[in-house]
């Protein structure tokens, strides 16, 4: 996962406070501040503080400081970071040496009169090391370039923003870098039949979903159906674009990092994936889970000679997504229609994909 931090270059305390507020509003997780401003920043909101003080959440030192400070910080459960200005080849060597110390979690690299080459060298040298490489930049374009260097890119970026608009752009960039695209295909509907009542799960999120967006749900790990959000206008009830009526408690849902959970395990504060008709994803936070007894439909579809199944509530407002990317109500499903699925050859063990033979029916 890529991450981003903010650092203000202003000498005015009120402007630095505004930068903290802008960061909070844009969901930036951490900010670099002066040690005498830590208490002030904590009063403004909940954000990780990076500073040259043991009172910070991430303790920061420079090349000139005694690294033993970081040992003490690590012993007390703090995260640690070294800020290095790269001006010479010796600075590059120092950066790679410090990164191999077991009490250093992050290095921040600031370049003088360079952008890419030294970063490439350091990323390549530390490719297999357990260190987070962070680049300091002055604009969002340079942030994007840093994230993409040598395909792997830096783990994080510190942006010195000009204004709130740049902070917001930076936040959007981070989100886009962390999108997980999934490969969707279509399966052919073979059977739809009522199966009685059961405990059905509605996922109410903290995000507004658009037409073409939903979540990947299924009874089997090897094939999940794209269940559409309740964002479609209908004559029966008001839209609920924050909601996916997902199915019964037993079903799987695809979550970030290609993990699955049972619908029954979800709760407020958990993160799940919103997926659109093109396979593009974004994370969202669950605000509420509603489990209620409702009439259910069994849906069977064929993919590459195998039968995939899921169970959904029997209601007009519950929709899958056609192979053309259009929402289609479960009451309108017929044999021969094509719907979007995510096929998967892996089995699941505690939600993690494993290469193991498994029979699901």
UniProtKB/Swiss-Prot annotation:
The gene is aroB'. It comes from the Archaea. This is 3-dehydroquinate synthase. It catalyses: 2-amino-2,3,7-trideoxy-D-lyxo-hept-6-ulosonate + NAD(+) + H2O = 3-dehydroquinate + NH4(+) + NADH + H(+). Its EC number is 1.4.1.24. The keyword Metal-binding does not apply. Catalyzes the oxidative deamination and cyclization of 2-amino-3,7-dideoxy-D-threo-hept-6-ulosonic acid (ADH) to yield 3-dehydroquinate (DHQ), which is fed into the canonical shikimic pathway of aromatic amino acid biosynthesis. It comes from Methanococcus vannielii (strain ATCC 35089 / DSM 1224 / JCM 13029 / OCM 148 / SB). Keywords: Amino-acid biosynthesis, Aromatic amino acid biosynthesis, NAD, Oxidoreductase. One of its GO terms (molecular function) is NAD binding. Belongs to the archaeal-type DHQ synthase family. GO terms for biological process: amino acid biosynthetic process; aromatic amino acid family biosynthetic process.
